[in-house]
């Protein structure tokens, strides 16, 4: 899962959106640095990552990547799940339009920005103003996201080529998304994530 899915599942679970978004920027035990609700959100994010990586649908999808891109498949798939969530948002969350949800999420996250790591602050400078969560629905933007990550982290250069794996297996990936994401939504609503 990437930014949109973590925020969405956090909302459904009535968990801290701030903590769920911040989690990838926090190493080790967050309890000394953040308030309890944010810490709970960080822990939820980490549980979701482990759960998602071990889903049979996701493990199967990783196998569809070529040898040269399989190492970055987990990252590529996380971004792709956000694509499908953004694309099908009106079906999955009909009572909370994506643009409104994005504004709501931004308001929640802004409350912790002053005490956040610099890399997280930098992300927020772009995430909201460039409307990433809404733009995830466009595959051209997904390609741009993957290229951007590859540019910032040379060891992840294979992300550029992983675009072709997404394109080649688009329909099958979408099917897998529909197989697991509604289950995760239900688990989040029961606070079981």
Curated annotation (Swiss-Prot):
Q: Name one GO biological process term.
A: fatty acid biosynthetic process
Q: Which GO terms describe its molecular function?
A: [acyl-carrier-protein] phosphodiesterase activity
Keywords in UniProt for this one? Fatty acid biosynthesis, Fatty acid metabolism, Hydrolase, Lipid biosynthesis, Lipid metabolism
The keyword GTP-binding belongs to this UniProt entry's keyword annotation: no
**Which EC numbers does the record give?**
3.1.4.14
> Where in this chain does the entry annotate a coiled-coil region?
none
Q: What class of enzyme is it?
A: hydrolase
- Known catalytic reactions: holo-[ACP] + H2O = apo-[ACP] + (R)-4'-phosphopantetheine + H(+)
NCBIfam families recorded for this chain? PRK10045.1
Similarity section: Belongs to the AcpH family.
Query: What exactly does this protein do?
Result: Converts holo-ACP to apo-ACP by hydrolytic cleavage of the phosphopantetheine prosthetic group from ACP.
Which protein, by its recorded name, is this? Acyl carrier protein phosphodiesterase
Q: Which gene encodes it?
A: acpH
